[in-house]
């Protein structure tokens, strides 16, 4: 059963998951499917790496074949399990062995598990898609987790759409938690997005790929360099 027994006090949280504001946003490279891309992202300066465990994703990672190389990544880099409406059994499998530092969940059917997930001690990120420029996408006051990710919307997709939204909307969402900006970010536009949204972190998948699931290392390097170059 999923409960506080899954908690591991011995695992130190990477900086990405501490909630401390820096002079520039943290960077998360998402949808990583192989060790070469993970290592390159870290060498270029990524603070976190996301692994998509949703079978319906173009970036789906078969976890059983990836545990060894994921666990070998530097401990100061946040390893984030990304899921879409996962079952309790799936979440328990992901949390086994402290392979991941945090959970990032898309969809809504997992909401009833939020309090139990927080009790495990794993930081929880709720990912939502911005569909309407005139209102908050859903009521966020109830959410007990670590952070909220705002992503672009495309019907039928749960993330990694490459779609942007009005970045300045993030400044209106006062929820007392770190806000992560995602959706359509690229090396060419991430500085402008940061200046408008002032997020805690930026998240990118499509914008640094040569094809779904395969990262373009030059784009990753340029994206991270662009974020690092944002003036305080």
Where do the language-model regions lie?
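Conserved N-terminal beta1-alpha1 strand-loop-helix module at the mouth
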Residues: 2-232
């Amino acid at each position: 059963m999923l409960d506080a027994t899954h908690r591991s006090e011995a695992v130190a949280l990477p900086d990405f998951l501490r909630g401390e504001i820096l002079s520039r946003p943290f960077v998360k490279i998402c949808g990583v499917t192989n060790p070469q891309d993970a290592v390159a992202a870290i060498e270029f300066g990524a603070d976190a790496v996301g692994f998509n465990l949703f079978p319906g994703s173009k970036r789906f990672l078969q976890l059983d074949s990836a545990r060894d190389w994921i666990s070998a990544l530097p401990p100061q880099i946040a390893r984030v399990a990304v899921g879409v409406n996962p079952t309790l059994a799936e979440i328990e499998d992901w949390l086994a062995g402290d392979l991941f530092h945090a959970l990032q969940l898309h969809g809504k059917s997992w909401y009833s598990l939020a309090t139990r997930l927080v009790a495990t001690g794993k930081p929880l990120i709720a990912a939502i898609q911005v569909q309407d420029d005139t209102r908050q996408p859903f009521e966020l006051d109830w959410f007990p987790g670590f952070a909220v990710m705002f992503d672009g919307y495309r019907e039928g997709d749960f993330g990694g759409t490459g779609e942007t939204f009005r970045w300045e909307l993030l400044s209106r969402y006062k929820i007392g938690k770190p806000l992560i900006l995602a959706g359509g970010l690229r090396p060419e536009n991430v500085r402008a997005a940061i200046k408008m949204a002032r997020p805690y972190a930026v998240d990118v998948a499509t914008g640094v790929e040569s094809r779904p699931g395969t990262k373009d290392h030059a784009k990753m390097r340029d994206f991270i360099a662009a974020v690092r170059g944002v003036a305080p």
